């Protein structure tokens, strides 16, 4: 499994940027995507995929320790849908 440092190193290797500059780029990408999603906007990268938010309905759950029924409130969660090129590359 690759982590953030692995991603930064690969970006540096592929672009010729320093690791410090690559880290800034990776961090900026994450921040920008987060800002768009927080405003309720989608981020579509053709061929790669789409970052979006989805509404999760309220539901009933259980406390695993007591078995007591609890209500879980509706919420908005981030989601990613892979694009065709990414799906094909992973096959």
Curated annotation (Swiss-Prot):
Annotated InterPro entries: Hist_DNA-bd, Histone-like_DNA-bd_CS, IHF-like_DNA-bd_dom_sf
Gene Ontology cellular-component terms listed: cytosol
GO MF terms held by the record: DNA binding; structural constituent of chromatin
One of the GO BP terms on file: chromosome condensation
Keyword Ribosomal protein (UniProt): no
Subunit note: Homodimer.
Family: Belongs to the bacterial histone-like protein family.
SMART domains: BHL
Name used for this protein in its record: DNA-binding protein HU
The keyword DNA-binding is assigned to this record: yes
Keywords: DNA condensation, DNA-binding
